[in-house]
Amino acid sequence: MMTNATGERNLALIQEVLEVFPETARKERRKHMMVSDPKMKSVGKCIISNRKSQPGVMTVRGCAYAGSKGVVFGPIKDMAHISHGPAGCGQYSRAERRNYYTGVSGVDSFGTLNFTSDFQERDIVFGGDKKLSKLIEEMELLFPLTKGITIQSECPVGLIGDDISAVANASSKALDKPVIPVRCEGFRGVSQSLGHHIANDVVRDWILNNREGQPFETTPYDVAIIGDYNIGGDAWASRILLEEMGLRVVAQWSGDGTLVEMENTPFVKLNLVHCYRSMNYIARHMEEKHQIPWMEYNFFGPTKIAESLRKIADQFDDTIRANAEAVIARYEGQMAAIIAKYRPRLEGRKVLLYMGGLRPRHVIGAYEDLGMEIIAAGYEFAHNDDYDRTLPDLKEGTLLFDDASSYELEAFVKALKPDLIGSGIKEKYIFQKMGVPFRQMHSWDYSGPYHGYDGFAIFARDMDMTLNNPAWNELTAPWLKSA
């Protein structure tokens, strides 16, 4: 039973916010909210996640197609990813996550291009297999340097039952390069999370075995970065630290990743998983089949960076451990100067977080390094093990919520009165118009990187720039207005 005053207040807030719902909906939504308790090792049945959103409720979740094409496969730069279906899905999933990559777009890198079969009514009636085959032929003519192609199926393709696997097999033989079908129709599952899982299974079945039995020169220090999508250059900032401590990064995907890097991943000694939610499936598979250990790491803020570097180093020998300590020491002065500059300007500010993937827990340490307090955290599409991993980083009584509706989120903000909200593009303009400082934490509000020591300097600057912007003097939050 929660005795903490903050916890009691937040329990009462949950009941108050849910009062507007009919009884059935109220009971269902109550299962998706709790207050944190440091004594708990697992959320157990205190919070329920990865369930279908309530009909009629405005949810900010994405779909399975978004999880596969927009997250896992889209950033693989030397492959072309076909959005097989209406043109809109491909356009809205094109380049919105700012997955930085090296290369020449349209020549040897294709991540920002929208390849679509542009389904029309006649394709629904007569099927789109022939159109898809023709599309792949034209792509090979126009973009011959692609190393492979994925077919990301959208809702209509699944509804009419097109056989994209047959088209993929025939095209692969004709082109002598991988053409990979991904059955990620948006209506499948309850959120983009199933799309991650589907894409992981496709990587397992179509890519990871491609170089099995072939020679590959290894070292004792080979690692792979998995699940860093290089938003604003995050993976590059992380890779620097790993290489400075003496590790060899054999593969990095999906951000700035290539097909051959994915194929080489089974040769590494350790898989480093950044986004646990989207990539834990493939990491577990490689652990079972190839006996490759894996670990989640967190490179947000100097405290968590040092903690993660030491945990990574513990997987290797004394040389790497010594190197890790040297890397941490090398950046201590720089980090101390950043904290000395920005912490006095940010100390005590309250933050509400609502994001997907890993960020609601990973960014907590970075905010705390700047003296800021997390008063509420929520996930759009988490599973219960995500909440289990979040509990240790939250103070007692912190509000924790899952798949919040627009109404619930606004009600929490009005009651908790955060100084800053970190969430997504769908929420950004609502809260800015309410007069609440906001950071778009899915793509770093067109800034970044935020990972690594280099990223923390930018993170601290951006939080200060957002909270202490004089423009907020021209706006007043609703709860600060006089009656």
From Swiss-Prot:
Keywords for the protein's UniProt record, in alphabetical order: ATP-binding, Iron, Iron-sulfur, Metal-binding, Molybdenum, Nitrogen fixation, Nucleotide-binding, Oxidoreductase
Cofactor binding notes: Binds 1 [8Fe-7S] cluster per heterodimer.
General function of this protein: This molybdenum-iron protein is part of the nitrogenase complex that catalyzes the key enzymatic reactions in nitrogen fixation.
Encoding gene per record: nifD
Superkingdom of this protein's organism: Bacteria
NCBIfam families: N2-ase-Ialpha, nifD
Taxonomic lineage: Bacteria, Pseudomonadati, Pseudomonadota, Gammaproteobacteria, Enterobacterales
Subunit structure, as described in the record: Tetramer of two alpha and two beta chains. Forms complex with the iron protein (nitrogenase component 2).
Amino acids binding [7Fe-Mo-9S-C-homocitryl] cluster: C275, H442
Family according to the record: Belongs to the NifD/NifK/NifE/NifN family.
Name of the protein in question: Nitrogenase molybdenum-iron protein alpha chain
Catalytic activity entry: N2 + 8 reduced [2Fe-2S]-[ferredoxin] + 16 ATP + 16 H2O = H2 + 8 oxidized [2Fe-2S]-[ferredoxin] + 2 NH4(+) + 16 ADP + 16 phosphate + 6 H(+)
Organism: Klebsiella pneumoniae
Cofactors demanded by this protein: [8Fe-7S] cluster; [7Fe-Mo-9S-C-homocitryl] cluster
A GO biological process held by the record: nitrogen fixation
E.C. designation(s): 1.18.6.1
Binding site for [8Fe-7S] cluster: C63, C89, C155
Entries under InterPro entries matching the protein: Nase/OxRdtase_comp1, Nase_comp1_asu, Nase_comp1_CS, Nase_Mo-Fe_asu
Database matches in PROSITE patterns: NITROGENASE_1_1, NITROGENASE_1_2
GO molecular function: ATP binding; iron-sulfur cluster binding; metal ion binding; nitrogenase activity
GO cellular component, one term: molybdenum-iron nitrogenase complex
Keyword Transcription: no
